[in-house]
Amino acid sequence: QMVLAADYAVEHNIGLVPDLDLRSARRAFISSYPDELQEMLRLQEVKLEKKKSTETIIASIDNLNDHYAGGKIPPYNAVKNNVLRVYAYKNGPAGIEPKTLSDITQQCRIEIISEDSVRIIIPPAGKNQPHACAMVSFTLFYPDIFGPHLIEFQKQILQQYSDARLSGVCKDEWGFPPYFPRFYTENTYDFWYSKHSAEEYARKTGGRELLSDCLLMARPMKKKETERQVAVNNFMEMVLQRNILIENSFYDAVKEIFGKDAAVTV
């Protein structure tokens, strides 16, 4: 059909520039690479009870959609979740006191409610640890921006239409799923995350752990403001450079497959 449409356009002196964004082919991507899905890491801080357990429920964001999700194309919603870590600490006027910070994940009870929500039962507050932060990863129906096969898959889509006389290719507003101000919830902090982005972060920062640095970025820590700023800059720069690489690869692939005069548009 694409070949016929392109031929018709050429015959009528019209340039056909279809949208061939891989987000429209998410089912095919996920079928081929089920371990390369984007995750949203949600951090939720709670005040702990002194003498009894504290229960908290963390849920994913509903209707995480845009114009690439609708009709017969599934939304970007969560397909599973995983409690990655629970920290306990004291959060004072100057921020989290690092000496009080400890990993209490193994002491918590976890109950999966559904693909998009989880209940965590946290034990009573320990000495100098009146606060806790649960870190839950929600795997989305969306390709991992840092997935090792994403760029290759993007090019394969274009190659499927190499026999069509297209004037170019477009894709609109590439990047992570949409995140709007209405999604913000007090004491909840969200980061785009995946095992592949964590590996890249460690590589770029000389071995730092993205998961623990997400807590540092989310909540100030006493006497660690400079370290926090560096973590934010490292994370943002890593995301920027990865998306530049993806966009440049798309541009180069369009020119290679459809010719140097092919349009690359949004």
Regions found by a protein language model. Give the residues of each.
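Mature N-terminal, pre-catalytic/accessory segment of carbohydrate-active enzymes
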Residues: Q1-P177, D252-A253, I257-K260
